[in-house]
């Protein structure tokens, strides 16, 4: 048995129905469903929050082939029951915007500075950053080019698309930039971002770290 992750196919899906397959007691209750729209924390992106019927889901995480939905209590929920599930759409959008902004920064820097390669990203609000390795250019040069390149890409409202099998070889493509493997959620185009600010660029021990924030 596995949880079908509907958000992999449609990041805009905010409501659905699902069947409860397991209830796990513990310090926090865990609800497992046959399918979900809740993005499980991972890949540098925070978890969705929302409701299973009227029960508040405060966190979602991967566990083997399941997505575990964390709750304070189960209320009257039972295994086998069909439930309505919904996510906090504003919360989803905040994290989707931060995630795609990280991809955009990686794509722009790799295009402008081919000797650099993105090696990781953390897309949490207030902590968002992308790290690169390779031949490090002057920080001032990166700062100047990235600011203008970000503004141009957002102004052009470049489309963001899912490529490949959403449940297999899923990739995210921003316009004509190379598609990258990703299991996160993203807006349909860059215009949603409005503004991405590069808050800090740091170079240390062969690693370039670009920290950023996204306008609400």
Report each predicted region and the residues it spans:
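Active-/binding-site microenvironments in catalytic and ligand-binding cores
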Residues: 1-216
